[in-house]
C-alpha cells in the first residue's frame, strides 16, 4: 500500500406595445405569418429581437446564450427557443467589439508536451467553460522572449484575465501585465507579496522532503538529476541540496544538470552517466517522473537492484509511475486542483470580489512505493 505524507435572478423586463390588429387595418389583404425581421446591415436576426421574443432583457438573453450560471434555467430555455425560432447565430466578433474585451482568459504555459501542464490547462478549461469563458493557450517553450511576445499579443485585445506560470519572466512582460489592469493569477509557485495572486506549492520544500526521505532510508551518497532546468526544477533541486548540506552529506559531483528536454530516454542516458562517474551512489532524486522511469528501465538493463543497490525517487507522479517495476516513489503534485483553484481565484478577481487569501498553498504528497 502506498504511504502518503501530506505537507502542508435575473430581472425580467417586459415591454408591451398596443397596436391595432393588421386585419382591422387592411381587411382585404391575405394575412400570412410574418418572417423574422432582419437587421438592415447584415440581414441576420439580432440579439435584441431574440430578447423581445423571449420576453427578457438583452443582457439576460446574452448571458443565457453564453451559458452563464447567473441566469435561471427557465430563462435559458426561453431564450434558446427564441434563438432557434429566429435562426439567430451568435457573432463573436461583434460581441467582442461591443464589449471592447473578449470573453476569454489567456493561459501561458512553457510546454504543451509536458503532462504536468496539460493536466493543469484541462482543469482550467473545465472550470471556466461553464461560465461561458473560453481559454487561449500560449506556449512559450520555456523562453522569456516568446512569453513576452505572447503577453503583447494577448493584451493587444485584452482578455478577461490571465493565468501565467510562475514568476520568472522578462521585466517588459511583467510591466505589460501590471499596466494592463487585466486580472492575473500565477500558478505553480508561491509568493507572499502585495497585490500578487498565486496558487501552487513550495518546490523547495518538496525537494527538502525527498532528501530527508532518502537520508532516513540510510542512503549516504545522494544524487540529483535534472533536465529542462526551468525555475521550478532548480527550486526543488535547491531544497534537496540544502537538506543534504544541513546533514553534512552534500557531494557536488553527484549532481547532473542538463537543459535538454526531460524524457524517459534522457533518464536512461543520465543514469548511465551517473553510475559510470560514481558507482557508489545509493540514492537518486530525479526532477521529473519521466527521468525516473528511464532510470528504472536502465537500472534493470544494468542488473542494478532498486532499491537494494540504489533508491530512486521521481517527481509529479505522472502516468505509469505506479506501474513501473519496481513501482516508483515520487512526489505527487496537485495539478488538477491547481488549475481549478487558479481559475476560481481568477473568476473572483474578474467579478471584483474580495479575495481572502491571495496566496494559496496546495501542498504536495510524498508517495512512498517500492523504489525508495
Question: What residue spans do the PLM features occupy?
Answer:
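Short beta-strand segments enriched in small/hydrophobic residues
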Residues: 53, 58-63, 97-113, 213, ...
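Short beta->alpha connector loops
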Residues: 141-144, 165-170, 290
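Residues at alpha-helix caps and immediate loop-helix transition turns in enzyme cores, especially N-
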Residues: 75, 116-120, 147, 173-176, ...
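Amphipathic helical "hinge" segments at domain boundaries
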Residues: 32, 73-74, 86-153, 158-161, ...
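Bacterial carbohydrate/catabolite-sensing allosteric modules
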Residues: 2-41, 85, 123-131, 155, ...
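Acidic, Gly/Pro-rich loop/turn segments at junctions of secondary structure
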Residues: 161-173, 186-195
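Short histidine/acidic/glycine/proline-rich micro-motifs that form metal-
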Residues: 66, 111-114, 141-142, 168, ...
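N-terminal helix-turn-helix DNA-binding module of bacterial transcription factors
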Residues: 5-103
Amino acid at each position: 500500500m502506498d504511504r502518503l505524507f501530506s505537507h502542508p435572478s435575473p430581472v425580467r423586463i417586459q415591454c408591451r406595445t398596443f397596436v391595432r390588429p393588421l386585419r382591422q387595418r387592411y381587411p382585404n389583404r391575405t394575412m400570412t405569418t410574418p418572417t423574422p425581421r432582419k437587421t438592415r446591415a447584415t440581414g441576420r436576426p439580432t440579439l435584441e429581437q431574440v430578447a423581445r421574443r423571449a420576453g427578457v432583457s438583452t443582457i439576460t438573453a446574452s448571458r443565457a446564450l453564453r451559458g452563464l450560471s447567473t441566469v435561471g434555467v427557465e430563462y435559458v430555455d426561453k431564450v434558446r427557443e427564441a434563438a432557434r425560432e429566429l435562426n439567430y447565430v451568435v457573432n463573436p466578433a461583434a460581441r467582442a467589439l461591443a464589449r471592447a474585451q473578449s470573453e476569454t482568459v489567456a493561459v501561458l504555459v512553457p510546454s504543451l508536451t509536458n503532462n504536468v501542464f496539460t493536466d493543469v490547462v484541462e482543469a482550467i478549461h473545465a472550470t471556466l467553460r461553464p461560465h461561458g469563458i473560453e481559454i487561449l493557450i500560449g506556449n512559450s517553450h520555456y523562453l522569456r522572449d516568446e512569453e513576452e511576445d505572447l503577453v503583447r499579443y494577448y493584451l493587444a485585445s485584452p482578455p478577461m484575465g490571465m493565468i501565467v506560470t510562475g514568476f520568472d519572466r522578462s521585466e517588459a512582460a511583467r510591466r505589460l501585465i501590471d499596466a494592463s489592469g487585466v486580472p492575473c493569477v500565477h500558478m505553480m509557485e508561491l509568493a507572499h507579496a502585495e497585490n500578487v495572486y498565486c496558487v501552487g506549492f513550495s518546490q523547495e520544500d518538496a525537494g527538502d522532503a525527498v532528501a530527508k526521505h532518502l537520508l532516513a532510508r540510510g542512503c549516504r551518497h545522494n544524487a540529483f538529476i535534472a533536465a529542462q532546468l526551468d525555475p521550478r526544477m532548480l527550486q526543488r533541486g535547491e531544497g534537496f541540496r540544502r537538506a543534504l548540506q544541513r546533514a553534512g552529506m552534500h557531494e557536488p559531483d553527484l549532481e547532473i544538470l542538463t537543459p535538454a528536454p526531460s524524457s524517459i530516454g534522457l533518464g536512461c542516458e543520465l543514469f548511465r552517466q551517473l553510475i559510470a562517474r560514481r558507482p557508489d551512489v545509493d540514492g537518486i532524486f530525479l526532477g521529473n517522473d519521466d527521468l525516473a522511469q528511464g532510470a528504472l528501465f536502465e537500472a534493470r538493463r544494468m542488473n542494478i537492484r532498486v532499491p537494494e543497490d540504489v533508491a530512486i525517487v521521481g517527481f509529479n507522479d505522472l502516468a505509469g509511475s505506479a506501474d513501473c517495476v519496481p513501482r516508483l516513489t515520487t512526489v505527487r503534485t496537485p495539478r488538477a486542483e491547481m488549475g481549478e483553484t487558479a481559475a476560481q481565484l481568477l473568476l473572483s478577481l474578474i467579478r471584483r470580489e474580495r479575495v481572502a487569501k491571495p496566496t494559496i498553498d496546495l501542498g504536495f504528497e510524498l508517495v512512498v512505493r517500492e523504489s525508495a
